């Protein structure tokens, strides 16, 4: 069965936790493990924070878009902004790379996404925005039977 939800919100840092909890609540219908749910929440936090800080440069007028599609035990997550874009995606995906060292950003966002998700695709165009496509296979819970 297919189920989906779409969310959009202002590019404000306080909305990052809203996005994380909302996506986790939606994905919970698949009965993921706590580790899987934590990984999804972490990835949402990283991608939304990237959109707010890097995509929109903390401009609250920007809008962050999230789509979640659940189908056959797979979570398809899309996080999009219409911000400044990424000039060099390959460089941006390198561990420790950051465009904002003055903010003490770790530069680990994409690395975390790649470690926690089964697939990560980043598409971006300078001055048009960035879209991050993420896929996670949820393992079937093994309930104890008496």
Curated annotation (Swiss-Prot):
SUPFAM superfamilies: ATPase domain of HSP90 chaperone/DNA topoisomerase II/histidine kinase. Coiled coil: none annotated. GO terms for biological process: asexual sporulation; negative regulation of sporulation resulting in formation of a cellular spore; sporulation resulting in formation of a cellular spore. Transmembrane segments: none annotated. Keywords: ATP-binding, Kinase, Nucleotide-binding, Serine/threonine-protein kinase, Sporulation, Transferase. The keyword Membrane does not apply. Gene3D superfamilies: Histidine kinase-like ATPase, C-terminal domain. It holds the Pfam family HATPase_c_2. GO terms for molecular function: ATP binding; protein serine kinase activity; protein serine/threonine kinase activity; sigma factor antagonist activity. Its EC number is 2.7.11.1. It is an enzyme of class 2 (transferase). It catalyses: L-seryl-[protein] + ATP = O-phospho-L-seryl-[protein] + ADP + H(+); L-threonyl-[protein] + ATP = O-phospho-L-threonyl-[protein] + ADP + H(+). The keyword Oxidoreductase does not apply. Binds to sigma F and blocks its ability to form an RNA polymerase holoenzyme (E-sigma F). Phosphorylates SpoIIAA on a serine residue. This phosphorylation may enable SpoIIAA to act as an anti-anti-sigma factor that counteracts SpoIIAB and thus releases sigma F from inhibition. Belongs to the anti-sigma-factor family. This is Anti-sigma F factor. It comes from Geobacillus sp. (strain WCH70).
């Amino acid at each position: 069965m297919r189920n989906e939800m779409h969310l959009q919100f202002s590019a404000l840092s306080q909305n990052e936790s809203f996005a994380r909890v909302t996506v986790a609540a939606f994905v919970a219908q698949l009965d993921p493990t706590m580790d899987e749910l934590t990984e999804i929440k972490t990835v949402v936090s990283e991608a939304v924070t990237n959109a707010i800080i890097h995509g929109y440069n903390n401009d609250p007028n920007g809008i962050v878009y999230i789509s979640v599609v659940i189908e056959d035990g797979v979570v398809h997550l899309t996080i999009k902004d219409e911000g400044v874009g990424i000039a060099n995606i390959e460089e941006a995906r390198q561990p420790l790379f950051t465009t904002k060292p003055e903010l003490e950003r770790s530069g680990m966002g994409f690395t975390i996404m790649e470690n926690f998700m089964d697939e990560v695709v980043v598409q971006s165009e300078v001055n048009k925005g960035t879209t991050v496509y993420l896929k996670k296979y949820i393992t079937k819970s093994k309930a104890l039977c008496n």
